[in-house]
Amino acid sequence: MKAVIVFCLMALSIVDAAWKPLPENLKEDLIVYQVYPRSFKDSNGDGIGDIEGIKEKLDHFLEMGVDMFWLSPIYPSPMVDFGYDISNYTDVHPIFGTISDLDNLVSAAHEKGLKIILDFVPNHTSDQHEWFQLSLKNIEPYNNYYIWHPGKIVNGKRVPPTNWVGVFGGSAWSWREERQAYYLHQFAPEQPDLNYYNPVVLDDMQNVLRFWLRRGFDGFRVDALPYICEDMRFLDEPLSGETNDPNKTEYTLKIYTHDIPETYNVVRKFRDVLDEFPQPKHMLIEAYTNLSMTMKYYDYGADFPFNFAFIKNVSRDSNSSDFKKLVDNWMTYMPPSGIPNWVPGNHDQLRLVSRFGEEKARMITTMSLLLPGVAVNYYGDEIGMSDTYISWEDTQDPQGCGAGKENYQTMSRDPARTPFQWDDSVSAGFSSSSNTWLRVNENYKTVNLAAEKKDKNSFFNMFKKFASLKKSPYFKEANLNTRMLNDNVFAFSRETEDNGSLYAILNFSNEEQIVDLKAFNNVPKKLNMFYNNFNSDIKSISNNEQVKVSALGFFILISQDAKFGNF
């Protein structure tokens, strides 16, 4: 049976595939933008981005066609993990502003027709949160808000109850003298895991959602959900065989600490809160897990779980069939009512351009915008920002710091979190201060929004062009078909019965290719050139059987009867 499954999955990468007619849910052609507040715009000159800075730049979202943006954590926090260690879920960290500033941002966004959602971090709190401090003292009802265990005695010595290893490495258990017990933390020791088997914890976290929804927020991006429940039998996890170092996260197979079935019931309870409100509220799920476990989130109330295939399944060395498989797998295994989505990057990864190079990064951006469903953009990727070198001395990310001077560059996420490059002025227009929390990329003189607005071939103007096309009601009706035109060229079409068709041709190889577009059914002989990454002077093609595609080249063709696209 395994062999059959593997064969079927492999076959998806080479056969023609089509999805038609396109269900209503696939017409949710939205663009979602991730704001990393520390690095977006500094309004007060302290070198750290803030809420007022985001408000100042809302028109940027409008210009690039964004429908909804989400804020990475802005809550009070000791900043051990840059806001993902929350000490108060219902307030704002002073470095970002005040809760009044946040209310004003919500109002300003809504006035411009933008939706705004918050990062919600339900798996753990900060160890400085009042709940944990009371739990340390064994005060009811907080004594059972976290997962405590007395450990076990081995050779006369007390040791952690299991061999579980945290995401950042080291034991997932830490001892506290106050409780004479170990507490669980799947991330940093300063991030104790909440106990969702305690219904009072779930009630309190549901109330956090209500607090922000009542203030006008349109929903949440929910962080790290696969870790939210554990197997309470506290069994040792089997060893992976990948390493002999018990302090490395890959030392064990996470069968008791990840993807526990009860997780999905918690998600449903979160959705129940969102459904209490008359206006539609959104829930976007972060879950790094396998495809089948990811797809289950659709059935438990998620608008969609993030599709991390561009992050997990392909690299700079991937070939065209890998990209076809990526698309086909998601579209095939997504439930009929699901909304597809495409996530090229986020704050935990190297930047898109640094992972793939500029031309392949442009191709991936093109795919994210022109495939059906939701395109998710990480701040700065719309202008092709790349990773910034950060020295060991200037490293801020705890994941990098914990790796030590010799290994920090392989672990630190700082290079992808540097200030947005607005223009070529001081600190790239991010701040009036030359001393920013992370250094600005030295390429900001040429890679910046102001410069790219003036260059018709820039990354930003490409993004705008495709975003505008995505918004066309006729384009939203278009069915999806995927093809391999040869071993090196992946193509997909968006076809309608009466309103025209689009053909995206992408050569991921380093050699020029000649392809026959008649691999698509009823493709017109003559097609207009909507976009060409290497030759913007070509306006059309008149022979669809012998089409040249430059090395690392791609172009978008539109039928002459199309009611979308501007010519």
From Swiss-Prot:
The protein's Enzyme Commission number: 3.2.1.20
Known glycosylation sites: N88, N123, N247, N290, N313, N319, N499, N507
Extent of the signal sequence: 1-17
Classification via SUPFAM superfamilies: (Trans)glycosidases, Glycosyl hydrolase domain
EC supergroup of this enzyme: hydrolase
GO molecular function: alpha-1,4-glucosidase activity
Domain of life according to the entry: Eukaryota
Site (Transition state stabilizer): D348
Tissue note: Expressed specifically in the hypopharyngeal glands of worker bees. Also found in the brain of worker bees (at protein level).
Pfam families from the UniProt entry: Alpha-amylase
Reaction catalysis annotation: Hydrolysis of terminal, non-reducing (1->4)-linked alpha-D-glucose residues with release of alpha-D-glucose
UniProt keywords, alphabetically: Glycoprotein, Glycosidase, Hydrolase, Signal
Catalytic-site annotation from UniProt: D223 (nucleophile), E286 (proton donor)
GO biological process, one term: carbohydrate metabolic process
Family: Belongs to the glycosyl hydrolase 13 family.
Function description: Converts sucrose in nectar to glucose and fructose.
Subunit comment: Monomer.
Protein name per Swiss-Prot or TrEMBL: Alpha-glucosidase
Lineage of origin: Eukaryota, Metazoa, Ecdysozoa, Arthropoda, Hexapoda
